[in-house]
Amino acid sequence: MDKNALRKQILQKRMALSTIEKSHLDQKINQKLVAFLTPKPCIKTIALYEPIKNEVTFVDFFFEFLKINQIRAVYPKVISDTEIIFIDQETNTFEPNQIDCFLIPLVGFNKDNYRLGFGKGYYDRYLMQLTRQQPKIGIAYSFQKGDFLADPWDVQLDLIINDE
């Protein structure tokens, strides 16, 4: 399917989620995130995101898990039409080499774990520059899986965590 058509279809479905249904799915996904992160004490800094357009939301017990395990969260900040950086919102500092794991929002994903974003390429450009092999985890609802071909500039994610 054409990426733009798929993007539109998935976004419509995501925006149609009821508050109760979204909350239930978010809880399931956050439980799976905690299960994924629990056996990994080497993760001390994690890249998160502020959800937009009904993306998966991180819930209180996930943030409590981060606090208990002393995992620092950093968030993306758009600094130009083509570039993002990740900053610690508490200290307003930018330390790209200290990110141990990326939790990445997406519009859609395919069977090979390629991410369909909003089409601006921010994450693809950023992730291509990494010098370490940090885990790149897509966060999505299961209905966001679609059939599309990756472009040469698309970055393959290591794993997609969803509600299934």
UniProtKB/Swiss-Prot annotation:
Necessary cofactors: Mg(2+); Mn(2+); Ca(2+); Zn(2+)
Keywords on record: ATP-binding, Cytoplasm, Ligase, Magnesium, Metal-binding, Nucleotide-binding
Binding sites annotated in the UniProt record for ATP: 3-7, 115-123, 125, 153
Domain of life the protein comes from: Bacteria
Coiled coil regions, renumbered to chain: none
Keyword Ligase included in the entry's annotation: yes
InterPro entries tied to this protein: FTHF_cligase, FTHF_cligase-like_sf, NagB/RpiA_transferase-like
The record's free-text note on cofactor binding: Magnesium. It can also use divalent cations such as manganese, calcium, zinc, iron, cobalt and copper.
Catalytic activity: (6S)-5-formyl-5,6,7,8-tetrahydrofolate + ATP = (6R)-5,10-methenyltetrahydrofolate + ADP + phosphate
Listed Pfam families: 5-FTHF_cyc-lig
Residues involved in Mg(2+) binding: 124, 154
Subcellular location: Cytoplasm
Residue sites binding substrate per the record: 50, 55
SUPFAM superfamilies: NagB/RpiA/CoA transferase-like
GO cellular component term, pick one: cytoplasm
Keyword Ligase assigned: yes
Enzyme Commission code: 6.3.3.2
Example of a GO biological process term: tetrahydrofolate interconversion
A GO term, aspect molecular function: metal ion binding
Protein family membership: Belongs to the 5-formyltetrahydrofolate cyclo-ligase family.
Job of this protein: Involved in folate metabolism. Catalyzes the irreversible conversion of 5-formyltetrahydrofolate (5-FTHF) to yield 5,10-methenyltetrahydrofolate.
Quaternary context: Monomer or homodimer.
Protein name, as recorded: 5-formyltetrahydrofolate cyclo-ligase
Species of provenance: Mycoplasma pneumoniae (strain ATCC 29342 / M129 / Subtype 1)
